[in-house]
Amino acid sequence: YFAPGASQYDRHLMYQTYDVTELVQEGENGLGCILASGWWSDSFSFRLYNYNYWGDRPSFLGRLVITYEDGHKETIVTDDNTWQYFGEGPYRYAGFFNGETYDARLEENYFNFSKSDFKADGLKKPEVITPVVMEEQEGIFPGAACWPAMNEKEPELVGSYQAPVHEVETFTAKSMTEPLPGTYIYDLEQEIAGVPVLKFKGKAGQKITIRYGEVLYPDLPEYKGLVGQMLQANLREASNEDTYYCK
């Protein structure tokens, strides 16, 4: 999850390496990737005006190196003349602070996108993106260190030196409540950073909203009518919710 991680992208861009030997077939092959905003574009903190520090859209730089049995190598790189962009898949939005929007009705447009014979309406020519030049700094609090740091040189491509984010443990909800009709709260009794796993049935186009929080409104007079519901005021401007449209 979340590759390539957070760095000051105008200084260092960390790349990931994968062994795809078992995926390469004789004849024509297709190479595809799925992009989200990450730390590159979108929100950079819970203050939503800290936005698009490095670029204004998800971007990708990659290459495939094939080593043949006789030892010679062939390198295939991302190129705006040979690659194509498709923006009508089911992932409509994905961001660290505002969650993900997924429309399952668009999955058929998306199947086999990494196959050589993939065809879909709406394929577009990609653009070469120039990273944003950092000319100003901002501190969250008076006297605090400012960030991002100013540009000093061209970005350096370096191999990832950090362990990837991966699944460590699976938690099951300890309890469930329904403070409002059709609104269910699942309590894990544990602070985690993770991915929810839910099973449900719905009609095509039905919207399912999943929100996340740390505390519930307490039983106090000032919270009359809200007791037992999820409190998200401490999340500041981050919406912190996922939206799923059934197919």
Give names to the regions the model predicted.
Residues 1-247:
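Extracellular/oxidizing-compartment recognition motifs
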